[in-house]
Amino acid sequence: MFNIHSVEIDWGGRPLKLETGKVARQADGAVVATYGETVVLATVVAAKSPREGVDFLPLTVDYQEKAYAAGRIPGGYFKREGRPTEKETLVSRLIDRPIRPLFADGWRNETQVIVTVLSHDMENDPDVLAMVAASAALTLSGVPFKGPIGAARVGFINDEYVLNPVLDEMAETQLELVVAGTADAVLMVESEAKELSEEIMLGAVMFGHRHFQPVIDAIIDLAEKAAKEPRELTVVDDSEIEKEMLGLVEQELRAAYAIPVKQDRYAAVGKVKEKAIAHFFPEGQEPKYDKLRIAGVFKELEAKIVRWNILDTGKRIDGRDSKTVRNILAQVGVLPRTHGSALFTRGETQALVVTTLGTGEDEQYVDSLSGTYKETFLLHYNFPPYSVGETGRLGGTKRREIGHGKLAWRAIHPVLPPHHEFPYTIRVVSEITESNGSSSMASVCGASLALMDAGVPLKRPTAGIAMGLILEGERFAVLSDILGDEDHLGDMDFKVAGTEQGITSLQMDIKIAGITEEIMKVALGQAKDGRIHILGEMSKALDRARAELGEHAPRIETFKIPTDKIREVIGTGGKVIREIVEKTGAKVNIEDDGTVKVASSDGESIKAAIKWIKSIASDPEIGEIYEGTVVKVMEFGAFVNFFGAKDGLVHISQLAAGRVQKTSDVVKEGDKVKVKLLGFDDRGKTRLSMKVVDQTTGEDLEAKQKAEAKAEGEAPAQAAGE
């Protein structure tokens, strides 16, 4: 019934198995990949004919995690998986980025890659396995894919690189780096690092590239057994059109790309394009070519002219040389009521970044395959259409916004203070108000400034820079702080963030083969110079965290109570803690280990809440004096609430010095009194005294009364002796 083919290798000390022919047989390509006991299914389906009216690759990649893979039932009312989580979106992008450049030029058939996690062993993260499975499924599918690719995760523990560290090891690593590529080229890098050097980062990339070669070999072995016949792809020769167009518009296009202002440049390029279209589509004549084809050739010509200019003259679109960073202006404290804010402007790219400090109530609960955990640092990136002078629909967060936000998150996360030292939930929002390249790195710079403006004690200021590359044969140019056009028309997008000490995040997307280790080394070195320059410009606004939190930020005090007292502080159904919050105005969060966090923007509220909680959580001490309230008057004495929720009895004989006829002669309900804890009777009832305490000053009179009594006893004895 099944025509099963499989390959198995040992990879990083665990078995990796790729199998096809048993599951999802109606897909063009389907591979079940197993690593340890983590299992994913990758499928590829491509439409039989090209999609009409498009001049791009219509590829969609979806990665999905099923709760059953970890033996869990989804939360929520419907108890089924809902919209993609942040992790699913990020892994979808992780798969997409290295495979997209490898589709043959001109492939316009709708192509969908779906990767589903079927089993998770809580040791091996499914993301790298998903990339491998998708590569294998594409290689088998028959679509024109110039793969396969391999992928690997690299850690750095005890000064050594570790291949595919298990989840438990990730807590110890100084580096989490995912790298993907072909047999002879690196195509994609995504990473977070604890201020590591350029040499260590480059070494990790090359280590990963070497160690996923056996995976590529295994996919090729499987393809030799089970690959489908390659799809036919008609390659159209546009050389004659390009030659004609070059003679028509080359000089005007070169002049347009010498205009430094983005909007003016786009307008000039638009006019040149109109001229080309008018030439190839004269009015009243039957057109010889399809409009999309002409537009595609024009786009290719744009890229060539920009690239030629840079390589021939060393000058870029806006007149800079390859190493110069655009003009920078950094400002902090730009919004009056926020906890921290910054406006970071670099050329025609601008980010307004705002930091908000919250409490434990504001932590994000993340439901993942490995369980639910709390996230205390959030960074959100928004890219409204006005930032590029366009109109557009505002709706849900797009994949690109999630990806850019996570990149900035990775850049900042390593320099944040430990949560036990700075127990705030931190949310940073980057609003991109202008964009002409490198908006994610502007978000990193703005986030660092906004956090320091809010008083968050970062280890060091952090900055980011986007690098580009133009490669033609033996000639190449590495570009610092790229423009949007240089990003689109170049061969590499290379984003580096970090401090003066080292790199905290590295993201790389390479569109062509042939980028050597030496070129990457040059790019990293040039990026370091640019990063140090940007940090210097940022320091003109703020070079360290403010000594005090923002005026409107909450203050948090942390202390511990015995775990057996947590129930008393919370009360039945949360009654006690709700009363504390309502009456003091402070927010209270109690963790399972007895850690209590009390937060408020008002210091008196915090003091009141702490005093209340401590009075409940600790036991009163015999001999201590407390202030209390008379809650009930009886014939034999008065009950006084004196220690949180604790009441005690002041017997009538302990109300006042001398004989008391009626309790009500001395106290009534609601009176504020000072009492001394005498002890506990045989039944554990609390015994209090008022008469041994000065009700005005709170002074302990018992010692004084004993001294007086002793003195009175000695006087008659002396008289008798005389």
UniProtKB/Swiss-Prot annotation:
Give GO cellular component annotations, separated by semicolons.
cytosol
Name the top EC class: transferase
The segment(s) forming the KH domain are 554-613
Q: Which UniProt keywords apply?
A: Cytoplasm, Magnesium, Metal-binding, Nucleotidyltransferase, RNA-binding, Transferase
| Cofactor requirement | Mg(2+)
Q: Where in the cell is it found?
A: Cytoplasm
The highest taxon in the source lineage is Bacteria
Mention one GO molecular function.
polyribonucleotide nucleotidyltransferase activity
Q: Which SUPFAM superfamilies match?
A: Eukaryotic type KH-domain (KH-domain type I), Nucleic acid-binding proteins, Polynucleotide phosphorylase/guanosine pentaphosphate synthase (PNPase/GPSI), domain 3, Ribonuclease PH domain 2-like, Ribosomal protein S5 domain 2-like
Per UniProt, residues of the S1 motif domain are 623-691
Residues the entry annotates as binding Mg(2+): D487, D493
Q: Where is this region: Disordered?
A: 697-722
Recorded family membership: Belongs to the polyribonucleotide nucleotidyltransferase family.
State what protein this is by name. Polyribonucleotide nucleotidyltransferase
User: What is the name of the gene encoding this protein?
Assistant: pnp
